[in-house]
Design a protein with these regions (language model features):
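Carbohydrate-binding surface patches
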Residues: 268-271, 276-278, 314-356, 385, ...
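Glycan-recognition surfaces
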Residues: 140, 174, 186, 190-280
């Protein structure tokens, strides 16, 4: 078995055919599961409310299902004393937050807290909370980290960026690095950090955080769910190794239609997003609660490989996504048929395109039932705003025959509009997967990389690259650190 890493420098790139393989990943931190206060309560939280939600996590069976974090979001701030030490809100949390964290821990759960990379919190801006002014981490990094994690005992922190963007002229990578270093300097525990910059911040985030937001805030509306899924469709290369693209807190139990809730939860699971419930757990509808406790979907999210599903087909307005489960390059894969459109969508995909062969057992993870076997292709017709998520167990695992540009890791990519020449993933009708990568090249580090290119036996392979530049371009191809012949290529 061989595994190779292929890097390519170009300006426009569609797909490649090559070889390689991969190793197993062990003992990764899975995506965070729990509850957070922001979606339902915003800044209007208090000690009794947080404790009541912790109680409900246990009594509703959510702890048993794997939800462990109870996160106190914005709204607990009071002021800073003459020494700069944070004080909690005198009415909302008159006893401080240590007793809240202790109570959460007494339930066998973990406790999360919130702050901002700048001076002011998001609540001070959007909810006009005067207590959110001057209480952010800026200028108090070590002091607040010591308070949050050593004195109060919290285990997780979400760090927003509202105050940082208010005139401080801070740079995201530098700012979050300073905060991570401050936390590590004062706390010897492994603190889970979430970067909340409302867009994919850059490949540097994986070195600092367990997860990072990739979109604007979620709302309990279908258009919001659809928008966020769309933002994450082509970010699979950046998730893995115990670090994840965060699609924001869940809106299950807050008014979506049942089929839309299935899309919401199912796609969050197959894309390995953190699962932080955002509704009132004491009044959650029974159907929503049962969906959140679907152990087969949870297992998909918490799979030990820690992979995010990627798009293998985009036709008729629908998407097919897949990822390995249980074992890399094994015979078990998860597949999602996702219809975001407002009309019925027909799907048909050869099993070879999913790299599976022979007789394939099919299990519906939403319905939690086996639905027979297939051999050649999967064919479904889905209503609007719906998803079908399957576990496929095949007799054979087939070698891939091509790699799409949109599956590649782009070291310079971010969604903050600060990358070289606006490097981005862009739709193109005639592209093999319907997408291209634009504006590669121009500097040595601006390349596309396929880290886990697979061939069972290895050997010599002919590499074909499809691309659509507006003029001739020079391509450099590197395989496992060895540069291949470089030629000036013509448009294909």
């Amino acid at each position: 078995m061989k595994f190779l890493r292929i890097s390519s420098l170009s300006l426009f790139l569609l797909s490649t055919i090559t070889m390689g393989a991969m190793a197993q990943i062990n003992q990764l931190d899975p995506p965070v599961m729990g509850w957070s206060s922001w979606n339902t309560y915003r800044i209007h939280i208090n000690e009794a409310l947080i404790k009541k939600q912790a109680d409900a996590m246990v009594s509703q069976g959510l702890k048993e299902a794997g939800y462990l974090y109870v996160n106190v979001d914005d709204g607990f701030f009071g002021w800073r004393d003459e020494n700069g030490k944070l004080q909690t809100h005198p009415e909302r949390f008159p006893n401080g937050l240590k007793c809240v964290a202790d109570y959460i821990h007494s339930k066998g759960l973990k406790a999360g807290i919130y702050s901002d990379a700048g001076s002011n919190t998001c609540g001070s801006i959007w909810d006009k909370d005067p207590n959110g002014v001057g209480v952010g981490l800026y200028g108090h990094e070590k002091q607040d980290a010591d308070l949050f994690f050593n004195e109060w005992g919290f285990d997780f922190i979400k760090i927003d960026y509202c105050g940082a963007g208010q005139s401080l002229a801070l740079e995201e990578q530098k700012r979050y690095t300073e905060i991570r270093q401050a936390i590590d300097a004062v706390c010897n525990r492994n603190i889970s950090l979430n970067i909340c910059r409302w867009a994919f911040p850059g490949t540097w985030a994986k070195d600092l955080a367990r997860s990072w937001r990739i979109s604007a805030d979620i709302t309990p509306k279908w258009e919001s769910i659809k928008y966020i899924i769309g933002k994450n469709l082509y970010l699979s290369a950046y998730a893995g190794g115990g670090h994840y693209n965060d699609m924001d807190m869940l809106e299950i139990g807050r008014g979506l239609k049942p089929e839309e809730e299935e899309v919401h939860f199912g796609m969050w699971c197959i894309m390995s997003s953190p699962l932080l419930i955002g509704c009132d757990l004491t009044t959650i509808p029974k159907s929503s609660l049962e969906l959140l406790k679907n152990r087969e979907l949870i297992a998909l999210n918490q799979d030990p490989l820690g992979l995010q599903a990627y798009v293998v087909q985009h036709k008729n307005g629908g998407y097919v996504l897949t990822k390995d489960m249980e074992q890399k390059r094994g015979k078990v894969r998860a597949v999602a048929f996702y219809n975001p459109s407002d009309t019925i969508c027909s799907f048909s995909i050869p099993t070879t395109q999913l790299e599976l062969g022979g007789k394939i057992k099919v299990r519906d993870l939403i319905k939690r039932q086996s639905v027979g076997t297939v051999t050649n292709k999967l064919v479904y017709e889905l209503p609007p705003h719906s998803v079908k998520i399957l576990r496929l167990e095949a007799e054979q695992r087939l070698e891939p025959t091509h790699y799409e540009a949109e599956w590649a890791y782009l070291p310079c990519y971010n969604d903050l509009a600060t990358h070289p020449r606006n490097i981005l993933y862009a739709p193109l009708k005639d592209a093999s997967g319907g997408m291209i990568v634009r504006y590669l090249g121009g500097q040595a580090e601006n390349y596309a990389e396929w880290n886990e290119v697979y061939s069972e036996k290895g050997g010599r392979y002919k590499l074909h690259i499809s691309y659509v530049p507006g003029a001739d371009r020079k391509l450099e191809v590197e395989v496992n650190g060895k540069k291949n012949d470089t030629k000036r290529s013509t448009n294909r």
